[in-house]
Amino acid sequence: MQNRWKDWVHVTKLDPDKSLPPAVIDEIATSGTDALMLSGTLNVTIENLGHLFKQVAQYGLPLVVEPAGPEAVLCEGIDLLFVPSVMNSNSVQWIVGKHQQWAQQSSIRWDKVIPEAYIVLNSSSSVGKVTGADCGLTPAEAAAYASVADHYFRFPIVYVEYSGMYGDPKMVRSIAEVVDRAILYYGGGISSADKAAEMGRWADTIVVGNAVYDLGPDVLRATVKAVQ
């Protein structure tokens, strides 16, 4: 599992603060997606994270927790922890501060941790607001963040996050052209096979989240087929 994640092309993001009936969970888990990421920005607790984990654990898919902060990290039974640092945040808290708190408060399973260099590009999103991200970047500015993340800090993942809004393919292309070693993730507004294929042209891995709740499993399956 430690390196198999590098081969994923489609990840489904599930929010612990949102609920889905068991039948829909079953359709998601059998859609062909490579992994399930348990992740949210607001109102994530150990309790609702644990509840979501119990819903999805039975399917045998790789399970990733992407914690929003040190107060809600689930490790037991989870394959990997994808831990974001928001490169374009105006606050050191979201780059390294919360990570320092986590290390001070907890005994961390570092063998499960995969660091992510987030570049947040939707100022209206919860993650954009909470982290104070500078979302008005030009393609050249965003690419520079990605280059620093890849070549200087050696992040294994560079994650372009539009969070609920479909992004600019030219922006993603500019970032893809400077990322050599890291795996490039794209998330935001993928609500059709065409959008999945368009972003999948530049990103190594696409992440589908809101469409699961807004449009249902059929759309999710279409996005899987578009990139696999």
Curated annotation (Swiss-Prot):
Residues reported to bind Mg(2+): D15, T41
Keyword Lipid biosynthesis: yes
Catalytic reaction equation(s): sn-glycerol 1-phosphate + (2E,6E,10E)-geranylgeranyl diphosphate = sn-3-O-(geranylgeranyl)glycerol 1-phosphate + diphosphate
Family note: Belongs to the GGGP/HepGP synthase family. Group I subfamily.
A cellular-component GO term for this protein: cytoplasm
SUPFAM superfamilies registered for this protein in UniProt: FMN-linked oxidoreductases
Enzyme Commission number, as recorded: 2.5.1.41
The organism of origin for this protein: Methanosphaerula palustris (strain ATCC BAA-1556 / DSM 19958 / E1-9c)
UniProt-listed InterPro entries: GGGP/HepGP_synthase_I, GGGP/HepGP_synthase_sf, GGGP_HepGP_synthase, GGGP_synthase_archaea
Protein name, per record: Geranylgeranylglyceryl phosphate synthase
